UniProtKB/Swiss-Prot annotation:
Extra information: Almost completely overlaps SMI1.
Protein name: Putative uncharacterized protein YGR228W
A GO CC annotation given for this chain: membrane
Transmembrane region(s): 21-41, 65-85, 93-113
Membrane topology: Multi-pass membrane protein
Coarse class of the protein's main subcellular location: membrane
Top-level taxon in the UniProt lineage: Eukaryota
Cell compartments where the protein resides: Membrane
């Protein structure tokens, strides 16, 4: 609901290009907060796995994916889903596997946007 209110406010006060970018940033930031909270609550070791998961997988995949795509596009949603899946399995994965998974999500985002 809050995202919809911000989205309407942005669209009524600025041009289409800048509002799309601002909406993408808003979605990116909110998805980062949501996925990071999921990471923190699903990890077994709070100070090791959750930090690795939040800043390696979530911020890279979800933020980059939503920033490079339009508001609520398929690639943004798929990138967020990819980060969520990676983060939910983060305590059981090595750092290398998590980084590769985030990279694949971002590559998928670039391919679907072009």
């Amino acid at each position: 609901m809050l995202i919809v209110i911000f989205h309407k406010a942005i669209f009524s006060n600025s041009s289409l290009a800048s509002s799309t970018l601002a909406s993408s940033l808003l979605i990116s930031f909110s998805s980062f907060l949501f996925i990071s909270s999921v990471c923190l609550f699903t990890s077994s070791s709070f100070f090791a796995d959750s930090v690795t998961c939040s800043f390696s997988t979530c911020s890279f995949s979800s933020t980059f994916g939503c920033f490079s795509s339009s508001f609520l596009s398929l690639s943004c949603l798929m990138s967020t889903l990819s980060a969520l899946i990676s983060c939910s399995a983060c305590p059981r994965l090595s750092v290398f596997t998590v980084v590769v998974s985030a990279s694949l999500g971002s590559v998928f985002t670039i391919l679907t946007d072009s």
